[in-house]
Amino acid sequence: MALSKRELDELKPWIEKTVKRVLGFSEPTVVTAALNCVGKGMDKKKAADHLKPFLDDSTLRFVDKLFEAVEEGRSSRHSKSSSDRSRKRELKEVFGDDSEISKESSGVKKRRIPRFEEVEEEPEVIPGPPSESPGMLTKLQIKQMMEAATRQIEERKKQLSFISPPAPQPKTPSSSQPERLPIGNTIQPSQAATFMNDAIEKARKAAELQARIQAQLALKPGLIGNANMVGLANLHAMGIAPPKVELKDQTKPTPLILDEQGRTVDATGKEVELTHRMPTLKANIRAVKREQFKQQLKEKPSEDMESNTFFDPRVSIAPSQRQRRTFKFHDKGKFEKIAQRLRTKAQLEKLQAEISQAARKTGIHTSTRLALIAPKKELKEGDIPEIEWWDSYIIPNGFDLTEENPKREDYFGITNLVEHPAQLNPPVDNDTPVTLGVYLTKKEQKKLRRQTRREAQKELQEKVRLGLTPPPEPKVRISNLMRVLGTEAVQDPTKVEAHVRAQMAKRQKAHEEANAARKLTAEQRKVKKIKKLKEDISQGVHISVYRVRNLSNPAKKFKIEANAGQLYLTGVVVLHKDVNVVVVEGGPKAQKKFKRLMLHRIKWDEQTSNTKGDDDEESDEEAVKKTNKCVLVWEGTAKDRSFGEMKFKQCPTENMAREHFKKHGAEHYWDLALSESVLESTD
């Protein structure tokens, strides 16, 4: 069912609000399309097909809400109209004109008597207070209305007290009472009292309702004209004459009354404050309206989203409007202080660079750093120790070498014999000679294969000759079909050809099955590949130590980590400024491949986004000296692995890096790499 233009206008704000809630922003195109669907009377399916290009997945939910709103609007309008009709009916029952006219026995219609005829004939005019509008009911008017209703009820009681009165009798005021008074009977006093009380109660309710309506209309200045008309119409309906307002009072403005001091006063002499209209800018008007709108948004109760099935409290709801950002002015002299701080920092760095350059030329810097790396010695160079370190293990503590005649017990365990310890084989060196494999040439491989096949064929022929195995079927092909079968091929060529092709397919199938039986499974291939990459390190672990100046590029880090994992190498990468140490442990073949990766395949001198920032801060001369490169510090063997899976460790200080290596028992790797870095920086 299509909707009228008025109904569509009432529905439009709700559709705009729903579209903004579904899409997150207002879209006039979707609103127009939805109004078009409702206006044409489409059903849910057609409306969903029409709106699907705009809303996608939210179409069905939006269409359901749209049709629910249409149904609610219809029901609300229906209930509103029914309530208006019932209210009018109730007022009509109390103050309306009588519709039922009693008839005489002859059937002649009598003239209808107005209900408040006596009131209409009265020329009395009720003056209203000057402060109230002529269309509004005053207290005196309401009192007059109550008195008129009481008189009308008294008159009706008099009419009902006669038997068959000539005048027409009105029907009972209450429509809810189905019983009618018979015309020819005398009304009882109890019934008359009941009728009077009901009429007075309804009149009181109607007066209260009218006063409440007038009070609400008074709050809306735009509707005061309509309110005046309604009030005047009600006064005429009740038989109360409205206050007469002269035409000159309506057309002419209110006279201005001034006192002796020139102030505006009313008729009673009280001072009146006039409203002064001052011109203002549009910007100020918009600002006031904006503040009022914000205040309304704050006062507006927020929708209860927690009752929604799809409400997620973790998701923050974005505000409908972006908060206005104010200007932030900088204090005077702020940037001058920043510039002065930067100049001071640059001068300090320049001074430090000059001192460092002078220290490099004199060698003070290098010797200082090497002294920090080298282990501390208890004795100075050239001093003779009192006891050698190898004797300290057998001499007891507190032994005094300065004593002239030491006791014999002090030499317990010392004899005049020389102890020769047992000879042990080195843990990693293997003196067994390595035999080189003998590889045949292609010609020798073919000859050996022919001999092997010939021997196997002779063995099969011997078994057939002795009757141990049945003779094999002749190997028939299409090319030797006539030569092998002869007469049979001539008699039934089709049958023979089918037989030959079946033999060929059988041989092909047997060949493929043999190949599949020899083929390794996926698990076996995986194990074979891992076995090929994993080398035997029972005789010793091969170790390589590399030093890289800059290892901040994530691509190069990934190459190191990925290749170490693929080659089943273990180790560690310690990241420190200008000294990045890479230690790898594994077999000799894997070390060979990893060495080629570090020294040849990776281009260390490539400029990256990370290294450019470091090089820009340094001078051109230092940038040339500190070109990124990788150096092999040391390679050798050890009995066991010192590290686990390849990992990266960030060490801001040298002590932290050395402690990390010391924890794994390999601090000498760090000392060696750092000393080479120090010596290289002095060159």
UniProtKB/Swiss-Prot annotation:
Which keywords accompany this UniProt record?
Isopeptide bond, mRNA processing, mRNA splicing, Nucleus, Phosphoprotein, Spliceosome, Ubl conjugation
Q: Where is the composition biased (Basic and acidic residues)?
A: 73-107
Highest rank taxon of the organism? Eukaryota
Q: Where is this region: Disordered?
A: 73-135, 161-183
SMART domains referenced in this protein's UniProt entry, alphabetically: PWI
Question: How does it get modified after it is made?
Answer: Ubiquitinated. Undergoes 'Lys-63'-linked polyubiquitination by PRPF19 and deubiquitination by USP4. 'Lys-63'-linked ubiquitination increases the affinity for PRPF8 and may regulate the assembly of the U4/U6-U5 tri-snRNP complex.
User: Sites of the modification Phosphoserine?
Assistant: 164, 619
Q: Which Pfam families match?
A: PRP3 (PF08572), Prp3_C (PF06544), PWI (PF01480)
Please tell me whether the keyword Ubl conjugation is annotated for this protein: yes
Q: Which segments carry the region annotation Mediates interaction with SART3?
A: 416-550
InterPro entries per record: Pre-mRNA_splic_Prp3_dom, Prp3, Prp3_C, PWI_dom, PWI_dom_sf
* Compartmental location: Nucleus; Nucleus speckle
Glycyl lysine isopeptide (Lys-Gly) (interchain with G-Cter in SUMO2) cross-link position in this chain? 139, 244, 252
GO CC terms, sorted: Cajal body; cytosol; nuclear speck; nucleus; U2-type precatalytic spliceosome; U4/U6 x U5 tri-snRNP complex
Residue ranges of every copy of the PWI domain listed in the record: 1-87
GO molecular function: any one?
Answer: identical protein binding
GO BP terms in the entry: mRNA splicing, via spliceosome; spliceosomal tri-snRNP complex assembly
Summary of subunit composition and partner proteins: Component of the precatalytic spliceosome (spliceosome B complex). Component of the U4/U6-U5 tri-snRNP complex, a building block of the precatalytic spliceosome (spliceosome B complex). The U4/U6-U5 tri-snRNP complex is composed of the U4, U6 and U5 snRNAs and at least PRPF3, PRPF4, PRPF6, PRPF8, PRPF31, SNRNP200, TXNL4A, SNRNP40, SNRPB, SNRPD1, SNRPD2, SNRPD3, SNRPE, SNRPF, SNRPG, DDX23, CD2BP2, PPIH, SNU13, EFTUD2, SART1 and USP39, plus LSM2, LSM3, LSM4, LSM5, LSM6, LSM7 and LSM8. Interacts directly with PRPF4.
Task performed by this protein: Plays a role in pre-mRNA splicing as component of the U4/U6-U5 tri-snRNP complex that is involved in spliceosome assembly, and as component of the precatalytic spliceosome (spliceosome B complex).
PANTHER family linked: U4/U6-ASSOCIATED RNA SPLICING FACTOR-RELATED, U4_U6 SMALL NUCLEAR RIBONUCLEOPROTEIN PRP3
- By what name is this protein known? U4/U6 small nuclear ribonucleoprotein Prp3
